[in-house]
Amino acid sequence: VKCYAVVDTNVIVSALITKNPDSPPRQVFRAMLTGDIVPLYHPDILAEYEEVLCQKKFHLQVETVRTVVDAIRQFGIEVQPKPTGEILIDMDDLVFYEVAMEKRDDGAYLVTGNQKHYPVRHFIVTPAEMVEILKK
């Protein structure tokens, strides 16, 4: 099953720094690279990925970060969402939510480790839930 999904930065970070190759974030990340998940993005999302992943605390090489961001750009679809008017706890998260909303007609999901940052919606799922959806 091919799924469209906006993947929150925290999931990408977890996928890249985990020691567990079978962790749900790693499985979601792998699915983005194999085409099981078509990543949806906006330039602001790619910029956030790059900014966060380059933080020293994650010990990731700049080349690794660029490769990841380029792969998401290459395999994904750029979305220019319409404003939803939604007010979120962290307004930096709004672009992730709005990109998912824009592609809801295609069944898009938002995959995040921080569900509390978003309104409760059935399409906002954890990495573990996304792994289960992919198995269907």
Task: Name each region found by the language model.
Residues 1-3:
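Intrinsically disordered, low-complexity and often Lys/Arg-enriched segments
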Residues 11-12, 45, 96, 116-117:
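Alpha-helix capping/helix-boundary segments
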Residues 43-46, 64-88:
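Acidic catalytic patch
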Residues 58-59:
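Membrane interface segments of multi-pass transport proteins and intramembrane proteases
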Residues 86-92, 116:
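Acidic, metal-coordinating catalytic cores used for nucleic-acid/nucleotide bond scission
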Residues 90-109:
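Acidic, metal-associated active-site segment
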Residues 105-136:
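Acidic, PIN/NYN-like endoribonuclease modules and their adjacent C-terminal/linker elements
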